[in-house]
Amino acid sequence: MTQTTAAVICGEKDIQLRTFELPSISADELLVKNISNSVCLSTYKAALLGSKHKRVPENIDEVPVITGHEYAGVIVEVGENLKDQFKAGDSFVLQPAMGLPTGYSAGYSYETFGGNATYSIIPKIAIDLGCVLPYDGSYYADASLAEPMSCIIGAFHASYHTTQFVYEHEMGIKEGGTLALLACAGPMGIGAIDYAINGPVKPRRIVVTDIDEDRLSRAESLIPVSAAKAQGIELIYVNTIEMEDPVTYLKSLNDDQGYDDVMVYAAVAQVLEQADALLGNDGCLNFFAGPTDKEFKVPFNFYNVHYESTHIVGTSGGSTGDMVESLELSAQGDINPSFMITHVGGLQAAPHTILNQLDIPGGKKLIYPHIDLPLTAIDNFASLAEQDPFFSELDAILAKNNYVWNQHAEKALLEFYDVSLSV
C-alpha cells in the first residue's frame, strides 16, 4: 500500500491536508505520482459550496474528496488488465472532463482521485473514457496547463457563424474577422489572447479590454502588439475603467462597426451588456466565465437576434481533442500556457490558496505536491534567498525569461527538493 498526503474537501469552506493509506489498485486502475497541479477557480467554487455543488458527494464529512483536476505526473503501478496500454515510469496528463450524467470528476468527487495529492488512483471509468493521455514532454507545468488551455480552445471552437438561408453552423470564430475579448487580462484571458493570435483561425483585429492597468500591462509585456502584427493581426489593449461610453469607443476601434466575435471572461452583468451591444451582424457572444449565482440574468437585445442574427453560446471545460491541441501547440512553441502562472507552491499551500483565490492577486497558482514551499510569487523568489542561496539562482533563471515560469525553473525546483521522476 502507498501512503498519500492530499488536500481534501471536508465541508463548506473546509479544506484540510490529510495523510492516509491508498488501497491496493484493482486490475483496471492506475497508481500515479502527481508531479504538478494548477489550481482552478472551479475548485474554489466546489470548496465554497461543499456538498451543495453538483459534482461534490453528500458524505464528504465522512469521506472527503481530493481537490485538483489540472494535473500531470508519472505512472507508478499499472493494473493487470491495463499492461498493454500503460507502463510504469511513463508520464501522463489527465483529461478530467468525463462527461458523466452525475457530473462527477477528478478533483471534486473522489476519495482517491485528484491532483492536490502526492499520489492518487485513477479509476477504471476515467481510463475507459480515454482520460489518461500520454505526455511525451518533460515540463509538467505545461501538461497541467493543457486542461485550462483546453477550456479556452473549446470555447473558440464552440463559437459559430451562419449564412442566411444556409441552415448549417460554421463552427469557430470568424477567420479574418474581428474579435473583442472583454475583461480578458486575467490568467485565462492571457491564454485566450495567446491562442487567438497563434491558433489555427486568425481574426484580423483583436481588441482586449480590462479595468486593471497592472493586468493589462503584464498581458502586453507577455504578448506585445508586435507579436500579433507578425501574424498579420492588429492587437489593441484598452482600459475601460474610466470610460463613460465604452461601447462607442470600442466600436470606433472597429470602423464604427460591431464585432464578429465577442468573448466575455468575467461573470459581470455590465460586461455582458457591453458584449451584447458590441455584436455586429451574425455576431457571436461567447460567455466563457462561469457564474456562481444560479439566477444570474442579464438583458439581451432580441431585436438584434431577429434582424441581425446575433447569438450566444457558452461552454464549460474542453474535450480531449482540445487538450491534445493544446499539448501539440505548446510542444511546437506556438503557444505558451506558462504565461498564466504567477505563483508556485507546495502541497501545504493548497488549502489556503484554493479558499482565498479571489484575494490572492495574479494569475494561475501552480502546486507541486512533493515540495515544501509556501505559495510564492515567481517574481519574489529573491526574498527567500536568506533561507537558501538556491532561490537566488531560481530568481536569476526567471529574470532571464521575463519572470515567466519555464522548464528550466521547474527542473531546478524539483531537483532542489529531490523530487524523483522515476519509479
Swiss-Prot record:
Q: Which residues bind Zn(2+)?
A: 40, 69-70
Q: State the phenotype upon gene disruption.
A: Deletion mutant cannot grow in minimal medium. Mutant fails to persist in the squid.
Q: What class of enzyme is it?
A: oxidoreductase
Care to name a GO molecular-function term for this sequence? Answer: mannitol-1-phosphate 5-dehydrogenase activity
**Which PANTHER family does this one have?**
L-THREONINE 3-DEHYDROGENASE (PTHR43401:SF2)
Assigned protein family: Belongs to the zinc-containing alcohol dehydrogenase family.
- How is this protein named in the record? Mannitol-1-phosphate 5-dehydrogenase
Query: Source species, please?
Result: Aliivibrio fischeri (strain ATCC 700601 / ES114)
Q: Which gene encodes it?
A: yggP
